[in-house]
UniProtKB/Swiss-Prot annotation:
GO MF assignments: small ribosomal subunit rRNA binding; structural constituent of ribosome
Organism, as annotated: Streptomyces avermitilis (strain ATCC 31267 / DSM 46492 / JCM 5070 / NBRC 14893 / NCIMB 12804 / NRRL 8165 / MA-4680)
Family to which this protein belongs: Belongs to the bacterial ribosomal protein bS18 family.
A cellular-component GO term for this protein: cytosolic small ribosomal subunit
A Pfam family reported for this protein in Swiss-Prot or TrEMBL: Ribosomal_S18
Superkingdom of this protein's organism: Bacteria
Protein's name according to its UniProt entry: Small ribosomal subunit protein bS18B
Biological processes, Gene Ontology terms: translation
Length: 78
């Protein structure tokens, strides 16, 4: 029996939230922005979920880690 052809769904790429809002500098003191990239358990969300570039993901991770060190963000929320 011949296989059915696989249909690819053409989806528009989701926009980068940082570029869309014009954010160029990611600061560890901006906890409202950083919380958007954390899960409800306090973990940093992946690039695939947040749609940021690799460089922005590295800057976000560094800012979140600095904010945790300064006790602005929790390490985890249980």
């Amino acid at each position: 029996m011949p296989r059915k052809p696989v249909r690819k769904v053409a989806s528009t790429p989701r926009p980068n939230p940082l570029d869309q809002n014009g954010i160029t500098y990611i600061d560890y003191k901006d906890t409202d922005l950083l919380r958007k990239f954390l899960s409800d358990r306090g973990k940093i969300r992946s690039r695939r979920v947040t749609r940021v570039t690799a460089q922005q993901q590295r800057l976000l991770a560094r800012a979140v880690k600095n904010a945790r060190e300064m006790a602005l963000l929790p390490y985890s929320s249980r």
